[in-house]
């Protein structure tokens, strides 16, 4: 989670992702309890202009912590205003309803909780299309990266400072080392994003995606990120 999601107040289109999100929208996923995910991502996604990723890269450290009671908390350090004025922001997610064969998982959350940022609030539902197959693989779960979750659909609502936005997305596990991500946020200043995750091993992955603004006729953004997940009891175990 993070300053994420959208950012309906920014132009050109900007977006952020995290271990428990797709390219730019939240899912019902949680970092497992007593685990931590660390991520490094570009804070600016523009591909052209003086403030583009290639001219003035802004690295953004991110972290998510798995907590009891189906909770996840995140602490990020994000560029505010001016862009190089980095400040901490908090993110929270709660999944009160877990998925089963018929019922989708449901999550509620808040992002961008910090001085200099406008908070966002979201409600999202996630449903695994091959749920039965994934259940059969549960015995392998502790050997698999948390991004490997089958074929799923996601939908929900995002409340920004001044508007409601629709969220739609999907992720499809191709094999044990590659997952396709695609998602969309409504609104003229938001985007559709398509990308994928290369899963290196249980703990590490690399994600890349391109964004096309809803009112653009070209690729308008690029997201690159590296993620490392580990257990708190064994922080140096690779």
Describe the predicted segments one by one.
Residues 4-6, 15:
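Cleavable N-terminal signal peptides
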Residues 11-12:
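Repetitive helical segments and hydrophobic/amphipathic motifs
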Residues 16-121, 126-153, 173-179, 183, ...:
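Transmembrane beta-barrel domains of Gram-negative outer membranes and organellar outer membranes
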Residues 158, 183-185:
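Glycine- and other small-residue-rich loops at beta-strand/loop junctions that grip anionic moieties
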Residues 159-164, 189:
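A general structural motif
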Residues 164-170:
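Short loop-to-alpha-helix "cap/lid" segments that border enzyme active sites
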Residues 171, 190-191:
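A C-terminal functional module that forms or caps the active site or interfaces directly
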């Amino acid at each position: 989670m993070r300053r994420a999601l959208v950012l309906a107040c920014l132009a050109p289109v900007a977006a952020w992702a995290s271990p428990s999100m797709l390219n730019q929208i939240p899912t019902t996923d949680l970092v497992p309890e007593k685990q931590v995910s660390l991520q490094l991502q570009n804070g600016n996604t523009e591909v052209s202009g003086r403030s583009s990723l290639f001219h003035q890269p802004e690295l953004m450290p991110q972290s998510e912590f798995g907590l009891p009671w189906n909770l996840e908390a995140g602490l990020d350090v994000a560029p505010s205003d001016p862009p190089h004025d980095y400040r901490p922001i908090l993110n929270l997610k709660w999944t009160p309803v877990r998925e089963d064969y018929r019922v989708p998982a449901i999550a509620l959350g808040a992002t961008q909780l910090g001085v200099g940022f406008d908070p966002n609030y979201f409600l999202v539902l996630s449903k695994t299309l091959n749920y039965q197959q994934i259940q059969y693989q549960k015995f392998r779960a502790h050997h698999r990266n948390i991004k490997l979750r089958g074929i799923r659909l996601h939908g929900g609502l995002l409340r920004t400072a001044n508007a409601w936005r629709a969220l739609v997305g999907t992720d499809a596990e191709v094999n044990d080392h590659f997952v396709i991500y695609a998602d969309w946020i409504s609104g003229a200043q938001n985007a559709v994003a398509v990308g994928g995750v290369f899963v290196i091993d249980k703990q590490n992955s690399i994600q890349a995606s391109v964004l096309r603004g809803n009112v653009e006729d070209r690729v308008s953004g690029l997201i690159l990120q590296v993620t490392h997940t580990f257990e708190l009891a064994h922080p140096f175990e690779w």
